[in-house]
Protein backbone atom coordinates (compact mmCIF):
# COMPACT_ATOMS: atom_id res chain seq x y z
CA UNK A 1 0.00 0.00 0.00
CA UNK A 2 1.44 3.44 -0.92
CA UNK A 3 2.42 5.66 1.94
CA UNK A 4 0.23 8.73 2.31
CA UNK A 5 1.81 12.16 2.46
CA UNK A 6 1.11 14.13 5.62
CA UNK A 7 1.94 17.83 5.69
CA UNK A 8 3.46 18.67 9.06
CA UNK A 9 4.00 22.36 8.41
CA UNK A 10 3.99 24.76 5.48
CA UNK A 11 4.84 28.39 4.74
CA UNK A 12 8.25 27.91 6.38
CA UNK A 13 10.79 30.69 6.39
CA UNK A 14 13.97 30.09 4.40
CA UNK A 15 15.88 29.83 7.68
CA UNK A 16 13.52 27.11 8.96
CA UNK A 17 13.66 25.27 5.64
CA UNK A 18 17.47 25.34 5.62
CA UNK A 19 17.68 24.10 9.21
CA UNK A 20 15.49 21.09 8.39
CA UNK A 21 17.67 20.25 5.40
CA UNK A 22 20.76 20.48 7.59
CA UNK A 23 19.40 17.83 9.99
CA UNK A 24 17.60 15.81 7.33
CA UNK A 25 19.81 12.73 7.79
CA UNK A 26 18.48 12.42 11.36
CA UNK A 27 14.86 12.86 10.27
CA UNK A 28 13.85 9.68 8.40
CA UNK A 29 10.60 9.89 6.47
CA UNK A 30 10.71 13.69 6.31
CA UNK A 31 10.98 15.42 2.94
CA UNK A 32 11.23 19.22 2.58
CA UNK A 33 9.56 20.39 -0.62
CA UNK A 34 9.57 23.75 -2.40
CA UNK A 35 6.19 24.43 -3.98
CA UNK A 36 4.46 27.28 -5.78
CA UNK A 37 1.40 29.03 -4.46
CA UNK A 38 -0.91 32.00 -4.77
CA UNK A 39 0.10 35.52 -3.80
CA UNK A 40 -2.24 38.50 -3.98
CA UNK A 41 0.06 41.55 -4.39
CA UNK A 42 -2.74 44.12 -4.21
CA UNK A 43 -4.08 42.76 -0.92
CA UNK A 44 -7.56 44.19 -0.20
CA UNK A 45 -7.94 46.00 -3.54
CA UNK A 46 -8.93 42.93 -5.59
CA UNK A 47 -10.29 40.67 -2.85
CA UNK A 48 -13.95 40.70 -3.92
CA UNK A 49 -13.16 40.40 -7.62
CA UNK A 50 -10.58 37.62 -7.44
CA UNK A 51 -11.78 35.97 -4.25
CA UNK A 52 -9.26 33.72 -2.54
CA UNK A 53 -8.03 30.15 -2.30
CA UNK A 54 -7.84 28.03 0.83
CA UNK A 55 -7.39 24.37 1.74
CA UNK A 56 -9.92 22.10 0.02
CA UNK A 57 -12.64 20.99 2.43
CA UNK A 58 -14.70 17.79 2.45
CA UNK A 59 -17.52 19.80 0.90
CA UNK A 60 -15.24 20.91 -1.96
CA UNK A 61 -14.28 17.30 -2.63
CA UNK A 62 -17.86 16.02 -2.60
CA UNK A 63 -19.31 18.83 -4.73
CA UNK A 64 -16.61 19.07 -7.41
CA UNK A 65 -15.51 15.95 -9.27
CA UNK A 66 -12.40 17.60 -10.74
CA UNK A 67 -11.20 18.79 -7.32
CA UNK A 68 -11.84 15.34 -5.89
CA UNK A 69 -9.93 13.66 -8.73
CA UNK A 70 -6.92 15.97 -8.48
CA UNK A 71 -6.82 16.27 -4.72
CA UNK A 72 -3.50 15.92 -2.94
CA UNK A 73 -2.63 16.89 0.65
CA UNK A 74 -2.39 20.67 0.92
CA UNK A 75 -4.44 21.41 -2.22
CA UNK A 76 -5.92 24.91 -2.21
CA UNK A 77 -9.05 25.70 -4.20
CA UNK A 78 -11.12 28.79 -4.97
CA UNK A 79 -13.59 29.70 -2.25
CA UNK A 80 -15.29 32.70 -3.86
CA UNK A 81 -14.87 35.32 -6.59
CA UNK A 82 -13.21 34.43 -9.89
CA UNK A 83 -11.06 31.88 -8.07
CA UNK A 84 -14.16 29.78 -7.41
CA UNK A 85 -16.03 30.56 -10.64
CA UNK A 86 -13.13 29.42 -12.83
CA UNK A 87 -11.72 26.78 -10.47
CA UNK A 88 -12.00 23.94 -12.98
CA UNK A 89 -9.99 25.93 -15.56
CA UNK A 90 -7.41 27.30 -13.14
CA UNK A 91 -6.66 24.12 -11.23
CA UNK A 92 -3.63 22.24 -12.44
CA UNK A 93 -2.37 18.74 -11.73
CA UNK A 94 0.52 17.76 -9.51
CA UNK A 95 3.50 15.73 -10.60
CA UNK A 96 3.24 12.35 -8.91
CA UNK A 97 6.16 10.02 -8.30
CA UNK A 98 5.88 6.56 -6.75
CA UNK A 99 8.87 4.65 -5.41
CA UNK A 100 9.52 1.21 -4.03
CA UNK A 101 11.29 1.50 -0.68
CA UNK A 102 12.94 -0.94 1.69
CA UNK A 103 12.13 -1.51 5.36
CA UNK A 104 14.11 1.59 6.30
CA UNK A 105 12.20 3.86 3.92
CA UNK A 106 15.09 4.14 1.45
CA UNK A 107 14.12 4.35 -2.21
CA UNK A 108 15.28 1.38 -4.24
CA UNK A 109 13.19 1.67 -7.41
CA UNK A 110 11.01 4.25 -9.15
CA UNK A 111 7.66 2.73 -10.05
CA UNK A 112 5.76 5.57 -11.68
CA UNK A 113 6.00 9.22 -12.78
CA UNK A 114 3.01 11.36 -13.73
CA UNK A 115 3.93 14.84 -14.96
CA UNK A 116 1.60 17.64 -13.89
CA UNK A 117 0.51 20.88 -15.53
CA UNK A 118 -0.08 24.43 -14.33
CA UNK A 119 -3.68 24.88 -15.40
CA UNK A 120 -4.94 27.80 -17.49
CA UNK A 121 -4.39 31.54 -17.07
CA UNK A 122 -7.21 34.05 -16.70
CA UNK A 123 -7.11 37.59 -18.06
CA UNK A 124 -9.58 40.20 -16.77
CA UNK A 125 -10.50 43.75 -17.82
CA UNK A 126 -9.95 45.48 -14.45
CA UNK A 127 -7.69 48.55 -14.67
CA UNK A 128 -5.38 48.38 -11.65
CA UNK A 129 -4.88 52.15 -11.37
CA UNK A 130 -8.62 52.84 -11.43
CA UNK A 131 -9.31 49.90 -9.12
CA UNK A 132 -6.86 51.25 -6.54
CA UNK A 133 -8.34 54.74 -6.89
CA UNK A 134 -11.86 53.49 -6.18
CA UNK A 135 -10.44 51.75 -3.11
CA UNK A 136 -9.08 55.08 -1.88
CA UNK A 137 -12.47 56.73 -2.44
CA UNK A 138 -14.17 54.02 -0.37
CA UNK A 139 -11.62 54.01 2.46
CA UNK A 140 -13.39 54.17 5.81
CA UNK A 141 -16.81 53.84 4.17
CA UNK A 142 -19.26 51.01 3.57
CA UNK A 143 -20.35 50.78 -0.05
CA UNK A 144 -19.25 49.83 -3.54
CA UNK A 145 -18.11 51.35 -6.82
CA UNK A 146 -18.42 49.69 -10.21
CA UNK A 147 -17.20 51.20 -13.50
CA UNK A 148 -18.07 49.76 -16.91
CA UNK A 149 -16.88 50.59 -20.42
CA UNK A 150 -20.18 51.52 -22.09
CA UNK A 151 -18.88 50.53 -25.53
CA UNK A 152 -17.59 47.06 -24.73
CA UNK A 153 -19.39 46.15 -21.51
CA UNK A 154 -16.05 45.38 -19.85
CA UNK A 155 -15.80 46.01 -16.12
CA UNK A 156 -12.99 48.52 -15.53
CA UNK A 157 -13.27 48.59 -11.74
CA UNK A 158 -15.33 46.82 -9.10
CA UNK A 159 -14.60 47.64 -5.49
CA UNK A 160 -16.50 46.86 -2.31
CA UNK A 161 -15.81 48.25 1.16
CA UNK A 162 -14.92 47.23 3.76
CA UNK A 163 -12.70 44.54 2.33
CA UNK A 164 -10.31 41.82 3.51
CA UNK A 165 -6.84 40.55 2.68
CA UNK A 166 -7.08 37.31 0.65
CA UNK A 167 -3.50 36.42 1.62
CA UNK A 168 -4.78 35.75 5.17
CA UNK A 169 -6.58 32.64 3.89
CA UNK A 170 -3.69 30.99 2.05
CA UNK A 171 -2.37 29.02 5.02
CA UNK A 172 -5.52 28.95 7.12
CA UNK A 173 -7.01 32.00 8.80
CA UNK A 174 -7.03 31.90 12.59
CA UNK A 175 -10.28 31.67 14.54
CA UNK A 176 -10.12 35.22 15.91
CA UNK A 177 -9.66 36.85 12.49
CA UNK A 178 -12.41 34.69 10.95
CA UNK A 179 -14.80 35.61 13.76
CA UNK A 180 -14.02 39.31 13.35
CA UNK A 181 -14.75 39.17 9.62
CA UNK A 182 -18.06 37.36 10.11
CA UNK A 183 -19.25 39.50 13.01
CA UNK A 184 -18.43 42.82 11.33
CA UNK A 185 -21.83 44.54 10.75
CA UNK A 186 -20.52 46.04 7.48
CA UNK A 187 -19.90 42.53 6.07
CA UNK A 188 -16.39 42.74 4.58
CA UNK A 189 -16.73 39.26 3.03
CA UNK A 190 -19.72 40.32 0.91
CA UNK A 191 -19.19 41.87 -2.53
CA UNK A 192 -21.72 44.67 -2.20
CA UNK A 193 -21.66 45.35 -5.95
CA UNK A 194 -23.23 42.02 -6.91
CA UNK A 195 -24.41 40.47 -3.63
CA UNK A 196 -25.77 43.40 -1.63
CA UNK A 197 -29.55 43.84 -1.31
CA UNK A 198 -30.83 47.41 -1.49
CA UNK A 199 -34.20 49.11 -1.78
CA UNK A 200 -34.68 50.84 -5.17
CA UNK A 201 -34.78 54.37 -3.70
CA UNK A 202 -33.99 57.15 -6.20
CA UNK A 203 -32.64 54.73 -8.79
CA UNK A 204 -36.18 54.04 -10.00
CA UNK A 205 -37.05 57.73 -10.53
CA UNK A 206 -35.49 58.03 -14.02
CA UNK A 207 -37.47 54.99 -15.16
CA UNK A 208 -40.74 56.49 -13.91
CA UNK A 209 -39.87 59.87 -15.46
CA UNK A 210 -39.06 58.34 -18.87
CA UNK A 211 -42.31 56.40 -18.81
CA UNK A 212 -44.24 59.57 -17.98
CA UNK A 213 -42.54 61.45 -20.83
CA UNK A 214 -43.26 58.66 -23.29
CA UNK A 215 -46.94 58.71 -22.37
CA UNK A 216 -47.16 62.54 -22.49
CA UNK A 217 -48.06 62.72 -18.81
CA UNK A 218 -45.31 65.28 -18.26
CA UNK A 219 -43.31 67.49 -20.60
Task: Set out the residue ranges of the language-model regions.
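An amphipathic alpha-helix/helix-turn recognition signal
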Residues: 129, 148, 203-207
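Short, glycine-anchored, charge-dense loop/turn motifs used at functional sites
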Residues: 149-156
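Short, well-structured active-site flanking segments
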Residues: 166-170, 204, 213-219
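Extracytoplasmic/periplasmic proteins that interact with beta-lactams or build/remodel peptidoglycan
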Residues: 1-144, 159-192, 197
Amino acid sequence: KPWETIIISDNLSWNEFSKINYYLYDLPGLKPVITVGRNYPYNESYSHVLGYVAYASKEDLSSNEIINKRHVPGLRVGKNGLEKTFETQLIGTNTIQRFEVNAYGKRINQLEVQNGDQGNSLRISIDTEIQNYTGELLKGEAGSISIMDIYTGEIIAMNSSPSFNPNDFLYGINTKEWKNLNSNPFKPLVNKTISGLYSPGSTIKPIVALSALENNIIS
